[in-house]
């Protein structure tokens, strides 16, 4: 005979009721039951007992418990009441009947007759099953173990968990989730608690199930309002991690509420969990039904009775916590009391252990350390006040190390923490959470509970935004940031949330569209970093809100097309046309560039305001970060044109053009030009009132991981050197990204300083679309490949919060995709243009005829006078005063030297209304103490700039011109890039950058290669920047000799630059004026002299400034004046620069009338016509030489040796070279060797 309990246990009544309904009307029963009920036999067999619903007078699961006082909580903005009704809380099992559960049923007492007036009701169906089950339960011999467990850690860690879930994916963890999971884990150590008793073939048997199936008592309300109890099982619990357990738990409860449970859900429960604590019951002994070995009861969480009348403050002061009572009612036939007691002790220890909570926090992806159990610290409240203030300071300093900012969470085993941020390390414990401490104005309060303090600190510094600002030295800036960061963030309105979603839709749909339509084409997609689009949008919107004039964006190639489309507003048709290779040749002179380097301009209209603002994106090369100084210079030029001033006191219009710079993480940390550019931030000649830096931190540089590409904790650490606040933000939280962007703009406007936003994200594909990143970064891409995109996760969050419906989200995305598809089809139909070789841009800009660069003598005199027009009481340095007097003398009498000729050119342009900007290392005085453009008072240090007087006409009216002269930082890369950018922003200005020595210009080689020499051909970007490069062999060694003429000549093509090496002050004067006035926007490279600055032969007369213009080819004055006889010349020496003076001195010394020296003043473009005409004047020449002091492989010869014979084949086919031998360095390091070599060149020229 078998005596195995029914597989449905307490749910037998429900199965029987379902069977009756099925028998009467099969359609009234869910179809999932049909297959089971067709063969079901409702008759009980053996000793099986029907389970029945609980009395409707019993408590229901959803009913909220009595409110708790002094609810403990972990730091949170609002600590939810601990006993708010939790989802899926098991309802209490029927209360135990009196008695000890003996197996022998006592005799039934006689039933007294009903009194008159009593109402009689015969119990049938489910109610009758209750009677039968309760009577049958008396046959199970039970005993009960009871244990009181501290609930404080359970309460506090649950608050931590739910606060995090509230901010991320939503949902809530109940106490029963945690207790149920702890119960399952304890069963692994005590498998006997999972057994049950049965009689098989008349023999007592203990059955150990293969799995743990936890029964949950669920209270249900019928259509008639009556309540009933079912016990559904979570199957195979022992195999589940916590997240899986919660999912299974919620699934069972949801299906129970919806009437979707199946027969399988009721069968096989091995141990049950009941929760009479929901109605305040502290301790109960539930009945144990056949088929189970134990039922665990959970009592209410209460303070000990003797403290329930105490105040919240007194309870906190005493360190009193709530208790929760667990009972284990077990079948004493197979489970012993010690075993049950140890089982409860294990649950007790587990709920207080670090490992249990660490496991749950990891499973829920909570990046913070759980609160730890500890005993109370008896120190005085005064002593702890100081510790609390230390804790606040620690969060302000180190809170960013705990922030949840990595969307990939690659190190999932590590909690984000720091010893300074743990309350235990400050002598504080969880018992202090509800104590009140003095906080001296923190968050606008004088006193706060530690729980509230921690909640505010974690919300401010440790959620999806990490803030670094304590490195800033200015206390006002620190306080400003604290006030905004430590204040509760206002949640975006639903309209704002929908707008953010629309930007994410646009960003993702754009990338998906290109990936689908242009498979395999490089586009350096933004996938994985789409939140940068709503971030940039929010920043630009805030700039518009401040009434600013323009946002200028500089960025690398990643995401550039998306920014062009969704931020700048470049037409999709144009972008897709470029993908099709469908470029109109009429608009595509020059080499052009790849589609992800091009720039554009648009107008941004506020979505929730009435303002608009200009937005532009500058062109850039693939040289990462090279665009940084260019952008800064471009913005400074625009600001100088607007001339709103530079008010540091909050004037909204000061610095009204905003540079927004996007970076990659590896480049920001790795490229030195970033630090060079940051160093410009506060310098008077370079300040732009703050740049918004956005780092698209995809945590990889091509294939290189951060630990191999930087030595700092963050890629942003370099920005600390300028005191910029740094915000690290999780790219999976677009609302946080938008909030940070607006705060960054507000800070920039308030303090006119740079701000850095470090948006951590990931790169969905390889470095480009043809790359497989899993080859070198497999662990990262195992995570990336299964990660849900930010658009999906944000959409789910909005839907989950009820902000939008699923249909609204789908419609928005579908509309955008349809728009792209329509444009794509239109592009397919556009006129196709044939592809041919690229065309030169040289003819696009031609020198105008008849351009006059001479000036009136009176203007020269005005400029000379300006140098002695010192302010009253101004004392020039005694060594400078003679220089000033000499300049006035030169202005009237002539013999003008190089330095004054330059100042005459610049001053005359200022007088003519030009903005002139001159910068470089030591430029105000001049490397060789030659310029003295700014005079310093010997006594007071005050400054006087004579040429600025030329900005005013003699009648007192302004000319419109300005003279801006600055000493630059010790930088070439950033400094040259800045000046190039300035000319892009103000094409009409004359902008000059001077190298300290021409040798050092190679520090800016990237700018020269990528912008100066090729910007016009690649992007149609025009610049008329001037580089002044001191050059000449004078025995100062290889690093103070050469500006590398050969490199510039190699770069020159299709009129890209003018390269000159003038040899007279007046020709230099006319060269600068021609460059400023000719309307051609192309760079000018001038190789300027050093020793020649003080060469008494290298001077010019006044008439050379007032009567002639720039001459690209010069003969010796003796021939130009008609004194020399050209017919006697049999040898022509072609040369440039200061070497001319050495050659002419030797010629005069030796009386060599047979030798003529012709100077080529303009090296490129070569003046073919003028050179030909000049050489034609010497009819009897038999040999031509190119003479240079540079080595044979350097200087002009490598190009001239090829080009001159082609240019003038009749004369220069046999052109020979006289120079130093080919050398790897520019010169010898010995001045004596230099002298020998120099003399050899001169001797050879006249041999």
Curated annotation (Swiss-Prot):
Residues 42-104 are annotated as: Linker. GO terms for biological process: tricarboxylic acid cycle. Its cofactor is Mg(2+); thiamine diphosphate. Thiamine diphosphate binds at residues 558, 622, 624, 665-667, 698. Residues 23-37 have a biased composition (Basic and acidic residues). It catalyses: glyoxylate + 2-oxoglutarate + H(+) = 2-hydroxy-3-oxoadipate + CO2; 2-oxoglutarate + H(+) = succinate semialdehyde + CO2; N(6)-[(R)-lipoyl]-L-lysyl-[protein] + 2-oxoglutarate + H(+) = N(6)-[(R)-S(8)-succinyldihydrolipoyl]-L-lysyl-[protein] + CO2; N(6)-[(R)-dihydrolipoyl]-L-lysyl-[protein] + succinyl-CoA = N(6)-[(R)-S(8)-succinyldihydrolipoyl]-L-lysyl-[protein] + CoA. Residues 354-1247 are annotated as: 2-oxoglutarate dehydrogenase E1, C-terminal part. The keyword Oxidoreductase applies. Residues 23-118 are annotated as: Disordered. GO terms for molecular function: 2-hydroxy-3-oxoadipate synthase activity; 2-oxoglutarate decarboxylase activity; dihydrolipoyllysine-residue succinyltransferase activity; magnesium ion binding; oxoglutarate dehydrogenase (succinyl-transferring) activity; thiamine pyrophosphate binding. Mg(2+) binds at residues 665, 698, 700. Residues 51-60, 66-88 have a biased composition (Low complexity). 2-oxoglutarate binds at residues 597, 622, 1040. Residues 105-353 are annotated as: Succinyltransferase E2. Alpha-ketoglutarate dehydrogenase and decarboxylase activities are inhibited by unphosphorylated GarA, and allosterically activated by acetyl-CoA, the main substrate of the TCA cycle. Residues 1-41 are annotated as: 2-oxoglutarate dehydrogenase E1, N-terminal part. GO terms for cellular component: cytosol; oxoglutarate dehydrogenase complex. It holds the Pfam family OxoGdeHyase_C. Homodimer. The 2-oxoglutarate dehydrogenase (ODH) complex contains multiple copies of three enzymatic components: 2-oxoglutarate dehydrogenase (E1), dihydrolipoamide succinyltransferase (E2) and lipoamide dehydrogenase (E3). Shows three enzymatic activities that share a first common step, the attack of thiamine-PP on 2-oxoglutarate (alpha-ketoglutarate, KG), leading to the formation of an enamine-thiamine-PP intermediate upon decarboxylation. Thus, displays KGD activity, catalyzing the decarboxylation from five-carbon 2-oxoglutarate to four-carbon succinate semialdehyde (SSA). This is Multifunctional 2-oxoglutarate metabolism enzyme.
């Amino acid at each position: 005979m078998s005596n195995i309990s029914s597989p449905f246990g307490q749910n037998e009544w429900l199965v029987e009721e379902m069977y009756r309904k099925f028998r009467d009307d099969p359609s009234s029963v869910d179809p999932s039951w049909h297959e089971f009920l067709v063969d079901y036999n409702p008759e009980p067999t053996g000793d099986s007992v029907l389970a029945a619903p609980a009395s409707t007078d019993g408590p229901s699961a959803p009913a909220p418990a009595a409110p708790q006082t002094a609810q403990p909580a972990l730091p949170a903005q609002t600590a939810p009441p601990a006993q708010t009704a939790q989802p899926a809380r098991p309802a209490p099992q029927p209360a135990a009947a009196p008695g000890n559960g003996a197996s022998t049923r006592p005799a039934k007492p006689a039933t007294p007759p009903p009194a008159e007036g009593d109402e009689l009701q015969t119990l049938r169906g489910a109610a009758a099953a209750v009677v039968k089950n309760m009577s049958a339960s008396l046959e199970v011999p039970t005993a009960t173990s009871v244990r009181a467990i501290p609930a404080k850690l359970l309460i506090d860690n649950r608050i931590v968990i739910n606060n995090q879930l509230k901010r991320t994916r939503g949902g809530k963890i109940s106490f029963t989730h945690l207790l149920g999971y702890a119960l399952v884990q304890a069963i692994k150590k005590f498998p006997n608690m999972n057994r049950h008793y049965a009689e098989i073939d008349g023999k007592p048997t203990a059955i150990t199930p293969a799995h743990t199936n936890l029964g949950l008592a669920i209270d249900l309300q019928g259509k008639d309002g009556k309540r009933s109890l079912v016990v559904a099982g979570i199957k195979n619990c022992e195999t589940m991690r916590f997240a899986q357990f919660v999912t299974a738990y919620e699934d069972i409860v949801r299906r129970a509420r919806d009437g979707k449970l199946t027969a399988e859900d009721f069968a096989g429960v091995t141990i049950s969990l009941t929760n009479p604590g929901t109605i305040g019951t502290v301790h109960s002994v539930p009945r144990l039904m056949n088929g189970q070995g134990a039922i665990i009861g959970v009592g209410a969480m209460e303070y000990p009775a003797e403290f329930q009348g105490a105040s919240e403050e007194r309870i906190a002061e005493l360190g009193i916590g709530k208790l929760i009572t667990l009972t284990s009612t077990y079948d004493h036939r197979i489970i012993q009391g010690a075993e049950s007691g140890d089982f409860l002790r294990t649950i007790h220890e587990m709920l207080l252990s670090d490992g249990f909570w660490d496991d749950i926090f990891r499973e829920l992806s909570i990046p913070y350390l759980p609160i730890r159990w500890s005993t109370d610290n008896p120190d005085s409240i005064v002593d702890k006040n100081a510790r609390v203030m230390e804790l606040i300071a620690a969060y302000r300093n180190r809170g960013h190390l705990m922030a949840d900012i990595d969307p990939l969470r690659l190190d999932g085993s590590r909690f984000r923490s720091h010893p300074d941020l743990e309350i235990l390390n400050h002598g504080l414990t969880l018992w202090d959470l509800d104590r009140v401490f003095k906080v001296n104005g923190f968050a606008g309060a004088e006193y706060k509970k530690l729980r509230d303090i921690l909640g505010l600190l974690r919300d401010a510094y440790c959620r999806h935004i990490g803030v670094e600002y304590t490195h800033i030295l200015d206390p006002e800036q620190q306080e400003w940031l604290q006030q905004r960061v430590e204040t509760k963030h206002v949640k975006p309105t639903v309209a704002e949330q929908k707008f953010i979603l629309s930007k994410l839709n646009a960003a993702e749909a754009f990338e998906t569209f290109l990936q689908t339509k242009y498979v395999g084409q490089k586009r350096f997609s933004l996938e994985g970093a789409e939140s940068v689009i709503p971030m940039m949008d929010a920043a630009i919107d805030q700039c518009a809100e401040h009434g600013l004039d323009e946002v200028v964006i500089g960025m690398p190639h990643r995401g550039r097309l998306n920014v062009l489309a969704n931020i700048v507003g470049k037409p999709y048709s144009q972008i897709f046309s470029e993908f099709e290779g469908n470029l109109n040749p009429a608009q595509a002179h020059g080499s052009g560039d790849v589609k992800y380097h091009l720039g554009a301009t648009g107008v941004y209209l506020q979505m929730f305001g009435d303002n608009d603002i200009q937005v532009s994106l500058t062109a850039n090369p693939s040289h990462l970060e090279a665009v940084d100084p260019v952008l800064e210079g471009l913005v400074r030029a625009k600001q100088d044109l607007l001339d709103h001033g530079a008010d540091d006191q909050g004037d909204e219009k000061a610095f009204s053009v905003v540079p927004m710079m996007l970076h990659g993480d590896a480049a920001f940390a790795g490229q030195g030009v970033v630090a060079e550019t940051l160093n410009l931030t506060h310098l008077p000649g370079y300040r732009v009132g703050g740049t918004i830096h956005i780092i698209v931190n995809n945590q990889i540089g091509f294939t290189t991981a951060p630990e191999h590409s930087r030595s700092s904790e963050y890629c942003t650490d370099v920005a600390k050197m300028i005191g910029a606040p740094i915000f690290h933000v999780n790219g999976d939280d677009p609302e946080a990204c938008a909030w940070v962007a607006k705060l960054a703009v507000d800070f920039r406007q308030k303090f006119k300083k740079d701000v850095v936003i470090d948006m951590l994200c990931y790169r969905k594909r390889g470095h480009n679309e043809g790359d497989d990143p899993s080859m070198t970064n497999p662990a990262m891409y195992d995570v990336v490949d299964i990660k849900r995109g930010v658009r999906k996760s944000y959409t789910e969050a909005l839907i989950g919060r009820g902000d939008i419906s699923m249909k609204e989200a789908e419609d928005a995305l579908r509309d955008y995709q349809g728009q792209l598809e329509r444009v794509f089809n239109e592009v397919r139909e556009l006129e196709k243009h044939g592809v041919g070789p690229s065309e030169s841009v040289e003819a696009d800009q031609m020198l105008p005829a008849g351009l006059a660069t001479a000036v009136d003598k009176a203007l020269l005199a005005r400029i000379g006078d300006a140098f002695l027009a010192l302010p009253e009481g101004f004392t020039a340095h005694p060594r400078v005063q003679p220089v000033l007097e000499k300049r006035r003398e030169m202005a009237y009498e002539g013999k003008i030297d190089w330095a004054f000729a330059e100042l005459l050119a610049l001053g005359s342009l200022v007088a003519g209304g030009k903005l002139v900007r001159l910068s470089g290392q030591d430029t105000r005085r001049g490397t060789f103490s030659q310029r003295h453009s700014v005079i310093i008072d010997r006594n007071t240090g005050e400054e006087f700039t004579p040429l600025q007087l030329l900005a005013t006409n003699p009648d007192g009216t302004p000319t419109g011109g300005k003279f801006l002269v600055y000493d630059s930082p010790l930088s070439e890369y950033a400094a040259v890039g800045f000046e190039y950018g300035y000319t892009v922003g103000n094409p009409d200005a004359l902008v000059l950058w001077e190298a300290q020595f021409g040798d050092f210009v190679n520090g800016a080689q990237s700018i020269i290669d990528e912008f100066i020499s090729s910007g016009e051909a690649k992007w149609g970007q025009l610049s008329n920047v001037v580089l002044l490069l001191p050059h000449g062999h004078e025995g100062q060694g290889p690093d103070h000799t050469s500006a590398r003429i050969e490199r510039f000549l190699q770069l020159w093509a299709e009129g890209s630059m003018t390269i000159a090496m003038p040899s007279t002050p007046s020709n230099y004067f006319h060269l600068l004026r021609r460059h400023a006035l000719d309307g051609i926007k192309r760079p000018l490279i001038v190789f300027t002299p050093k020793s020649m600055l003080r060469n008494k032969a290298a001077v010019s007369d006044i008439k050379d400034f007032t009567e002639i213009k720039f001459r690209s080819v010069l003969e010796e004055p003796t021939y130009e004046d008609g004194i020399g006889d050209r017919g006697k010349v049999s040898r022509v020496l072609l040369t440039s620069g200061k070497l001319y003076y050495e050659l002419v001195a030797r010629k005069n010394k030796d009386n060599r009338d047979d030798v003529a020296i012709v100077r080529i003043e303009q090296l490129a473009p070569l003046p073919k016509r003028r050179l030909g005409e000049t050489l034609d004047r010497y009819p009897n020449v038999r040999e031509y030489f190119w003479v240079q002091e540079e080595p044979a492989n350097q200087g002009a010869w490598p190009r001239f040796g090829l080009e001159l014979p082609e240019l003038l084949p009749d004369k220069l086919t046999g052109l020979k070279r006289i120079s130093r031998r080919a050398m790897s360095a520019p010169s010898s390091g010995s001045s004596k060797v230099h002298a020998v070599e120099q003399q050899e060149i001169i001797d050879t020229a006249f041999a």
